[in-house]
UniProtKB/Swiss-Prot annotation:
Name this protein carries in UniProt: Diaminopimelate epimerase
Gene Ontology molecular function, alphabetical: diaminopimelate epimerase activity
UniProt site positions, description: Could be important to modulate the pK values of the two catalytic cysteine residues: H138, E182
Organism: Campylobacter jejuni subsp. jejuni serotype O:2 (strain ATCC 700819 / NCTC 11168)
Taxonomic lineage of the native organism: Bacteria, Pseudomonadati, Campylobacterota, Epsilonproteobacteria, Campylobacterales
Primary location class: cytoplasm
Amino acid sequence: MKFYKYCASGNDFVITNADRKEDRSALAKELCNRYEGIGADGFIVILPHEKYDFEWEFYNNDGSRAAMCGNGSRAAAHFAHHINKINPNMSFLTGAGIIKAKVNQDKVEVSLGKIKSVQNTFEELGKTWQLCNTGVPHLVHFCQNLDEFDTMLCQKMRQKYNANVNFVKILDENHLKVRTYERGVEDETLACGTGMGACFYLAFLNKKVQNKVKITPKSGEEVGFAYKNEELFFEGKVKYCFEANYNFF
């Protein structure tokens, strides 16, 4: 199987083409294993589609399916344009709906669409939380110090609410810093696109930031977010790492 390794603001992905849908959960888990496989946060399968430029299957590191992945969508768009030679302005089908993307060399902007849902704030485990769905559910906690991030606490919240968990610090009205515990990886990752989107949207909704901001995830790779016409836009660099063949024994 020919595969391509991609990175986007700290998240890494294994991407391949396929001609039909099937359950690839076991394969995803094998490929994403950092000790015995290729190593990645997620596995993306690009499939043909009659109406859109392509359709994808997205698998988390543990083999579970996910409807959406922000950084994964940017990596998929970069792959579709540079490897599959699809037009740089494209749309593709995910489990969370249609994603529109624009590729400009190594920069990719995607529209994450309209926010699916937002719930009221609540108190739990000594912190204030809000739940926001940007294609997948995210718990968000605004803090003064990102050292508050606690993996054990995140595990408890993730298990109870079946959601990703984010800690966010507002540096100023144009800049946020975010740390994310991702379900499916079951640990903190270097970045999470939909998580950063949830943090930005809630900060904007609460009038704490402008409608266009920079966000720095744990990886340090700064990305841009904007909210316009009731849609969430996400832009940043994508890196093609390498391509190779994976042999099954």
